[in-house]
């Protein structure tokens, strides 16, 4: 039994040039019961193989689903055996699964009616060697569903479909396939649409690099009409280039101002002979500017960075790919170190992993992954995940709840086991089971509960699900709101109870967070609860929703992050030392300048690394950043390269404007909400590739030195640094807290 998803009549085969030989038929999309959408079958059945009753039934289905919106439910067909029809249609019929199609060429009809629209199907060669489905021709003037829609469009004075293309019968099929699985238009040949493309297909055939040549090929009589728009785009591009240059000039000009103000101290002013200059320097306004110059430095640094970021953001949003590429190329000082492929792969981040694509990666029989894990991670790292619904499925794999090689049945068993284990862990801290051997343990436990409750009440209260501390999580009635609750931007002040209130947490989602953290305290008794864990837990809960699943994702995340929270701080200290060495190698000028500013230890980076930039970005951005990190696509410590990208991005502002520790600390503290995570991820990837090549070159040089008996090594090459070498590893660094004792400092 199959479901008819799409039906189009009067689709013809043209076996000869004689129109009398044309073969009329039906083009169908069907789906067997209990099959996934990407397993839908595209079928062509000639009318000659159908009875009058069957033709009548199909025409009724065409009226229902041929041009219906996506919300229309599937119609189940019981009386037509499609496979039998295909097999008995004398070789004129065919069927092919959508998952077996590489691409489809949709050739629209001639506007003047000289030829009809058609489509050409290109199967995957490894699955259909020697088989080429015939070209299908859409005789729209004979098809009832197409003519009906054309009448409606003409009546509305709009002959175009939703994508602003001239409507014809093939558009309906294309839209329906796009509902079922990923369908991407090629900029190289606009008539070609890739079906469920791989990431390499997207890079090769839907590349932004092709945008300019594609636009040039589209020039026609509309060129004059679009000239004004293009001129405006050119002006906008020029404007942002100029603004970016102004920021650079301002950066350089402050060198003169800095020198001038430094050399004109009160003692030196008396030595200046110029009467006018003396009068100017004695002016009260000038003195005030001089006294406020430290804060002005931070302002100038932020301003120049802001202009630069706005210019880059405009270039990306308006497809000015070459300009953005050149900016990155110059900023990172890339010469011939990286190949064009490496640079393009880093820059092309516009292809997220979609739900349809994700579903197509799994075997329909046992639910096992059909592609390599690296291919999936490539999609995630370079494009992210399409939406939160998909994150709820994928994060379980990234956080190792589910093995990548598991089957669907095995994952169901894992869910049942982990849910039961979580319930057992929760029981251990319930009032009926909780007992203490001594007063110290009881005091420690109560202190942990207090800390958890206190931090949970402060956790991401700007998010809707955590905003109101009410029993149902909804806004309280207006009469119950304090006077200052009219300001919805500060729900904490209106809804929070005092820190020592026993029933302070009422919001059901906050209660779930509290339960998870208390259970983790039992699960990892040596570490317990440490401030900052709520920052790590909140995004996972927002996605997973279920308490038990959130808990296990969090525990696996904490396996990676536990070294950041060790009591002796050795884990985070080791990362800071690694970052210092990395900056010395990759950004030597910045490293030297920071040392002069007493900031060479990079203390201002501490908080960012501690909770993986949670405080610097919005929730949606953090989800993108973390799922990139969790892939370990290049390195298990890729967060250090992301931090390196932040330093590199701001290096010119620091070098030219800031020269004191407190200025630098203030500057980085004010970066919250000002950073572009996507741009930083591009820079981080290119910096890693550059670092990787540098390490390989230095390792080769070191081997050459070692093999030469006449050579003697002086100093230590960077590749001999264990910390830097470890950055090339994809294996997570796991460090656990030691045994907790009564004397442990919490």
Curated annotation (Swiss-Prot):
Keyword presence, NAD: no
Polar residues bias: start-end ranges: 481-491
Site residues, Arginine finger: 458
GO molecular function: GTPase activator activity
Modified residues (Phosphoserine): 265, 339
Pfam family, one: RabGAP-TBC
GO biological-process terms attached to the record: regulation of vacuole fusion, non-autophagic; vesicle-mediated transport
Disordered: annotated span: 470-505
Keyword field: Cytoplasm, GTPase activation, Phosphoprotein
Role according to the record: GTPase-activating protein (GAP) that most effectively accelerates the intrinsic GTPase activity of Ypt/Rab-type GTPase YPT7 involved in vacuole docking and fusion. It is also active, but to a lesser extent, on YPT31, YPT32, YPT1, YPT6 and SEC4. Provides a catalytic arginine (arginine finger) in trans to accelerate the GTP hydrolysis rate of the substrate GTPase.
PANTHER family (alphabetical): SMALL G PROTEIN SIGNALING MODULATOR 2-RELATED, TBC1 DOMAIN FAMILY MEMBER GTPASE-ACTIVATING PROTEIN
UniProt protein name: GTPase-activating protein GYP7
């Amino acid at each position: 039994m199959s479901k008819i998803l799409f039906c189009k009549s009067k689709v013809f085969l043209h076996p000869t040039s004689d129109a009398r030989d044309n073969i009329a038929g039906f083009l169908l999309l069907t789906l067997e019961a209990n099959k996934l959408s990407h397993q839908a079958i595209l079928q062509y059945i000639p009318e000659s193989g159908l009875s009058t009753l069957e033709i009548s039934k199909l025409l009724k289905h065409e009226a229902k689903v041929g041009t219906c919106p996506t919300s229309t439910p599937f119609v189940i067909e019981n009386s037509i055996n499609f496979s039998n029809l295909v097999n008995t249609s004398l070789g004129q019929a065919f069927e092919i699964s959508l998952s077996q199609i590489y691409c489809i060429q949709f050739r629209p009809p001639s506007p003047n009616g000289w030829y009809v629209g058609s489509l050409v199907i290109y199967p995957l060669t490894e699955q259909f060697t020697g088989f080429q489905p015939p070209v299908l021709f859409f005789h729209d003037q004979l098809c009832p569903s197409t003519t009906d829609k054309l009448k409606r469009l003409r009546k509305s004075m709009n002959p175009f479909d939703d994508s602003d293309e001239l409507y014809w019968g093939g558009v309906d099929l294309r839209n329906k396939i796009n509902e079922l699985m990923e369908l991407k238009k090629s900029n190289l040949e606009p008539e070609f649409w890739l079906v469920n493309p791989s990431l390499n297909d997207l890079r090769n055939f839907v590349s932004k690099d092709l945008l300019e040549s594609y636009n040039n090929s589209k020039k026609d009589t509309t060129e004059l009409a679009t000239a004004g728009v293009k001129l405006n785009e050119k002006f906008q591009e020029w404007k942002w280039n100029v603004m970016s240059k102004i920021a650079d000039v301002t950066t350089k000009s402050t060198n003169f101002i800095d020198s001038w103000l430094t050399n004109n101290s009160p003692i030196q002013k008396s030595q200046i002979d110029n009467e006018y200059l003396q009068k100017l320097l004695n002016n009260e306004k000038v003195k005030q500017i001089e006294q406020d110059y430290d804060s002005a430095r931070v302002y100038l640094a932020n301003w120049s960075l802001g202009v630069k970021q706005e210019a880059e953001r405009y270039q990306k949003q308006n497809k000015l790919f070459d300009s953005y590429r050149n900016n990155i190329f110059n900023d990172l000082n890339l010469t011939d170190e990286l190949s064009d492929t490496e640079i393009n792969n880093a820059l092309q981040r516009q292809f997220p992993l979609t739900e349809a694509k994700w579903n197509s990666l799994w075997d329909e029989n046992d639910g096992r992954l059909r592609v390599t894990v690296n291919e999936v991670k490539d999609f995630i790292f370079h494009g992210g995940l399409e939406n939160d619904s998909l994150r709820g499925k994928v994060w379980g794999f990234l956080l190792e709840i589910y093995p990548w090689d598991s089957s669907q049945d095995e994952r169901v068993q894992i869910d049942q086991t982990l849910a039961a284990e979580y319930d057992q862990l929760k029981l251990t801290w319930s009032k009926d089971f909780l007992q203490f051997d001594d007063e110290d343990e009881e005091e420690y436990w109560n202190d942990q509960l207090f800390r958890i409750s206190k931090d949970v009440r402060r956790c991401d209260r700007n998010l809707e699900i955590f905003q109101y501390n009410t029993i149902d999580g909804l806004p309280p009635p207006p009469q119950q709101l304090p006077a200052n609750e009219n300001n919805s931007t500060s729900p904490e002040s209106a809804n929070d109870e005092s820190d020592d209130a026993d029933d302070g947490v009422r919001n059901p989602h906050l209660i779930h967070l509290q339960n998870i953290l208390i259970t983790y305290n039992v699960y990892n008794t040596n570490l317990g609860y440490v401030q900052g864990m709520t920052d790590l837990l909140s995004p996972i809960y927002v996605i997973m929703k279920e308490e038990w699943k959130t808990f296990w994702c969090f525990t696996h995340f904490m396996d990676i992050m536990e070294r950041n929270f060790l009591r002796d701080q050795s884990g985070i200290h080791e990362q800071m030392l690694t970052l210092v060495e990395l900056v010395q190698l990759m950004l030597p000028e910045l490293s030297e300048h920071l040392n002069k500013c007493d900031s060479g230890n990079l203390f201002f980076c501490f908080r960012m690394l501690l909770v993986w930039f949670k405080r610097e970005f919005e929730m949606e951005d953090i989800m993108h950043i973390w799922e990139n990190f969790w892939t370990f696509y290049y390195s298990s410590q890729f967060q250090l390269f992301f931090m390196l990208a932040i330093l590199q991005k701001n290096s010119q502002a620091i070098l030219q404007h800031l020269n004191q520790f407190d200025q630098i600390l203030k500057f980085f503290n004010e970066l919250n909400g000002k950073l572009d995570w996507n741009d930083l991820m591009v820079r981080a990837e290119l910096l890693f590739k550059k670092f990787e090549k540098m390490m390989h070159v230095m390792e080769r040089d070191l081997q050459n030195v070692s093999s030469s008996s006449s050579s003697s090594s002086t100093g230590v090459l960077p590749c001999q640094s264990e910390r830097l070498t470890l950055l090339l590893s994809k294996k997570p660094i796991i460090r656990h807290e030691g045994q907790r004792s009564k004397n442990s400092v919490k």
